[in-house]
């Protein structure tokens, strides 16, 4: 975010220059100096304040540092711009406001959506829709699993709290514009659902507004809808458009024409917004430069900051209410005291797609479950009765997590990045887990590998005795990490005297919330390109069946097979999987790409890769989509012992 600030400052027309940057990271300081070469660099904020006399300090640091840094800046006589979320608690905001007034300085918050075109246009149109009677602020987003730099992102609830100010301040600002005056006692109602969905009702005078923020609602969206006695305004912040319906719309001709008017506005507005964005070469977040200009102008003229104290304060307080509600959810999912019927299990990877289901199933069958993960899950992602311990498998803390355990299920693995990441977080972590388990006296280990580590059937069926791939790097970093981890497990089991069971799941799919496996094809908007033939079978396994199988193996470890290719007992065809996909996406168009077409295209792509990246490993796309045949006999026998998979 700091780089966006540097670019936006450089783009302002109000005379302003970036004179200094403070960052404990040399990489961070250098990245800013590449944008603003004249900026002097400091390793700490205290050093910067001793060496410089800035008019404005931009605070673009982790949230837990905002209050202290803002207070230091105000005490030094600086105006302060604070990125959202501004601070964690209303009491902190009140203290900063008091200090700013005392020092005759101002505070501005990172509420840049108010300076984007949709918000500005909507404000201009407000008088045309008559007396406002309702405002709706809606925000739907998908939490990131990785940052742009490839690091593990914040957990989902913290991502929610990070973006929450946007829909909150939009609602508050429109309420303030429509009905000036203090909000009546804060939120009228506020709730946080078990999936992280926030619902709220806020009121200012006679005008009420609703707030909805969801992690699971689709499509991703962000809008404000204002309804008045003479029409409505829909400000769309995803497509950067505004659709307006001015007039009562009660006549027969209006009812017929309104959809066409809205369609024209949407198509024209979206096309224009795309053109403006590309034509201007947007280098920072939309609205950021405009907000900076307005704030700097207010400082030069001695006027009020562009974001009112009331809006900033109420935004912080509403977000604080949500933070407290989320903390309440965490209390509800705390481990319950009970008499365990099964072993004590350390589960790595217990916050992932498969791991979450395994943790729930282990707890359900009576195991004491301890999950070790690099970050704690959001409250709504925690399994009841499961203990979560934050730590890195390659660092200290693993030995402590293993204390009192009877068994380890090692399901953690790197899922992104290149060779170094998979070497560290798949292969290296696997070695650390097994050696630590042996040192802690935990002799039973279930290692979760992947079906992708096995060589091709070459006309026969792949079963538990099929050899591993000879060229471990031929299928990319992920498969290489999984394959070398399995080889390492086999070696260390003998060296350390461990009893190890290896489970190789096929592509894991959740039939209750269906997302197509990668080997089925690729979705491009509303078109799905399916590769191969409708009759091809895919080596997949139902998430629920996989979790119940792993829990059953933990409960009856001694009877578990040494190797298990975990698959659905009856493998589905691509046609069957596409039929399920179409059920959830009735507007989807399916196009088939036969293998006889893909093979020459893949050969051409390999040639281009060798020309463009000499010495690099070329990826054979046709090999990725090859059709293999699997012997599901062992999975079928286990399924019968578990009853039919749901």
Can you describe what each PLM-predicted range is?
Residues 55, 389-428, 432:
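NAD(P)H-binding glycine-rich loop region in Rossmannoid oxidoreductase-like domains
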Residues 147-219, 225, 310, 544:
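Rossmann-like dinucleotide-binding domain that binds NAD(P)(H)
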Residues 5, 36, 40-99:
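Beta-loop-alpha module in the N-terminal Rossmann-like domain of NAD(P)-dependent dehydrogenases
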Residues 108-110, 428-478, 501:
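Conserved Rossmann-fold NAD(P)-dependent oxidoreductase catalytic core, especially the SDR/UDP-sugar
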């Amino acid at each position: 975010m700091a780089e966006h600030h540097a670019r936006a400052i450089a783009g302002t027309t109000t005379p302003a220059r970036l004179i200094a940057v403070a960052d404990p990271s040399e990489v961070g300081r250098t990245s800013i100096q590449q944008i603003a070469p004249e900026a002097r660099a400091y390793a700490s904020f205290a050093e910067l304040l001793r060496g410089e006399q800035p008019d404005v300090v931009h605070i673009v640091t982790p949230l837990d540092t905002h209050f202290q840094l803002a207070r230091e800046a105000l005490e030094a006589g600086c105006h302060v711009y604070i990125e959202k979320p501004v601070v964690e608690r209303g009491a902190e905001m009140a203290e900063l406001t008091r200090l700013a007034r005392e020092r005759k300085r101002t505070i501005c918050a990172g509420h840049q959506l108010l300076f984007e075109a949709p918000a500005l246009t909507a404000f201009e149109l407000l008088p045309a829709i008559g007396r406002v009677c309702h405002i709706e602020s809606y925000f739907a987003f998908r939490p990131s699993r990785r940052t742009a730099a490839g690091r593990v992102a914040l957990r989902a609830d913290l991502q929610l709290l990070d973006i929450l100010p946007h829909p909150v301040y939009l609602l508050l600002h429109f309420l303030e514009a429509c009905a000036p005056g203090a909000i009546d006692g804060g939120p009228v109602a506020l709730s946080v659902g078990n999936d992280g969905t926030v619902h709220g009702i806020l009121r200012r005078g006679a005008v009420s507004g609703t707030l909805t923020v969801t992690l699971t609602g689709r499509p991703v969206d962000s809008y404000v809808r204002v309804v008045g006695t003479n029409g409505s305004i829909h400000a769309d912040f995803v497509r950067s458009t505004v659709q307006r319906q001015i007039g009562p719309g009660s006549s027969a001709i209006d009812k017929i024409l309104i959809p066409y008017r809205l369609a024209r506005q949407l198509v024209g507005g979206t096309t224009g917004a795309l053109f403006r964005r590309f034509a201007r070469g947007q280098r920072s977040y939309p609205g950021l430069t405009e907000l900076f200009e307005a704030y700097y102008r207010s400082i030069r003229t001695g006027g009020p900051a562009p974001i009112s104290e009331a809006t900033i304060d109420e935004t912080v307080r509403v977000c604080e209410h949500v933070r407290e509600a989320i903390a309440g959810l965490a209390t509800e999912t705390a481990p319950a005291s009970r008499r365990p019927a099964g072993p004590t299990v350390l589960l790595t990877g217990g916050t992932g797609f498969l791991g979450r289901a395994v943790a729930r199933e282990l707890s359900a069958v009576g195991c004491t479950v301890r999950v070790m993960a690099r970050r704690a899950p959001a409250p709504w992602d925690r399994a009841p009765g499961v203990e979560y311990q934050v730590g890195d498998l390659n660092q200290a803390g693993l030995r402590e997590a293993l204390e009192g355990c009877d068994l380890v299920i090692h399901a953690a693995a790197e899922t992104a990045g290149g060779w170094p990441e998979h070497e560290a977080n798949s292969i290296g972590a696997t070695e650390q887990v097994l050696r630590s388990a042996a040192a802690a006296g935990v002799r039973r280990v279930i290692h979760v590998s992947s079906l992708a580590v096995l060589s091709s059937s070459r006309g026969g069926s792949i079963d538990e005795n099929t050899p591993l791939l000879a060229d471990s790097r031929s299928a990319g970093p992920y498969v290489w990490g999984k394959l070398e981890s399995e080889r390492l497990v086999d070696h260390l089991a003998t060296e350390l005297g461990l009893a190890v069971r290896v489970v190789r799941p096929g592509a894991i799919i959740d039939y209750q919330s269906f997302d197509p496996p990668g080997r089925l094809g690729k979705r491009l908007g509303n078109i799905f390109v399916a590769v191969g033939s409708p009759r091809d079978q895919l080596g997949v396994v139902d998430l629920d069946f996989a979790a119940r199988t792993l829990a059953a193996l933990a409960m009856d470890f001694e009877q578990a097979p040494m190797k298990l290719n975990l698959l659905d007992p009856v493998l589905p065809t691509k046609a069957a999987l596409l039929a399920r996909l179409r059920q959830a996406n009735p507007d989807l168009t399916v196009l088939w790409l036969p293998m006889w077409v893909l093979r020459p295209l893949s050969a051409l792509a390999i040639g281009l890769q060798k020309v463009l990246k000499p010495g690099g490993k070329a990826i054979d796309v046709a090999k990725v989509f090859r059709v293999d045949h699997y012997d599901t006999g062992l999975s079928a026998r286990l399924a019968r012992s578990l009853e039919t998979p749901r």
